[in-house]
Amino acid sequence: MNISFSKSAIDDLKSIKEHYLAQGLPQIGQDFIVAIIEHIETLAAHPSIGRVVPEFNDDSIRELIHSPFRVVYLRESESINIIRV
């Protein structure tokens, strides 16, 4: 299954990295980004692993929790679109 990232999701990942860089913790920021992306990659084999986002109550809009972050994605028949992090 193909996984794509919206511009908003890419911007979110950049913001996470910049936040930790500004705190003087660039390696922690980089480690978080790598771990989040690895978690997202599990969706290719298990697209329904995330729970339905309560605010939307739509089975196709799901979330993975990667504490303290939430990855919101759209599950479609042939692809997954990462909406926000």
Specify the residue positions occupied by each region the protein language model found.
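Basic, Lys/Arg-enriched alpha-helical interface segments
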Residues: 2-60
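Enriched for short, Lys/Arg-rich terminal
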Residues: 66-70, 74-85
